[in-house]
Amino acid sequence: MITKQNDKKMMESPRFNIRVYGFLIDGGKILVTDEFRLGILMTKFPGGGLKYGEGLIDCLKREFMEELHAEAHIISHYYTTDFFQATTMLPFESQLINVYYLVKVNKPYLFTTTEKKFDFPEIIDGAQCFRWIPVNALSEDQFTFPIDKMIVGRLKNV
């Protein structure tokens, strides 16, 4: 809820956490990433945080190169968060804004996938693996974060 006190606080030091994600869909399946970061096991879509000085597409391309060793080709913008969501993973208050794009990646894929959730050699910070999930089998409970959970219903219509 926006109040005069909150409004004044945000005007003094607005903080936004902007995350950019790609939906890579192939053969009716969508790529997800299982990760262990900041002491949390999480399932989300490939992508990550915007760095100062980056554009949204540059961020997504960097994230795909870092995570998947693949160049993301943007097909289209899919969704940008249009409601308030507080960031829960940072040690300070900020507003989370997620931006999602439909993407393609050249084949053959250079990344490996698994069928088992959290299929890491060991659970250490930065552990990551990728899985394909049939789009028609997506459900909110497969994802960790509120905005990803919300977007799942929309994806079934892609």
Model-found features: residue ranges?
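Acidic, metal-coordinating catalytic segment for phosphate/diphosphate chemistry
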Residues: M1-F23, G27
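A short coil-to-beta-strand element that immediately follows conserved catalytic motifs
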Residues: E71-T80
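Nudix hydrolase/Nudix homology domain
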Residues: I40-T43, L110-V158
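Short, P/G- and charge-enriched loop/turn segments at secondary-structure junctions
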Residues: Q5-E12, T87-P91, K117-F120
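Active-site-adjacent beta-strand/loop module that shapes the phosphate/pyrophosphate-binding cleft
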Residues: Q85-E115
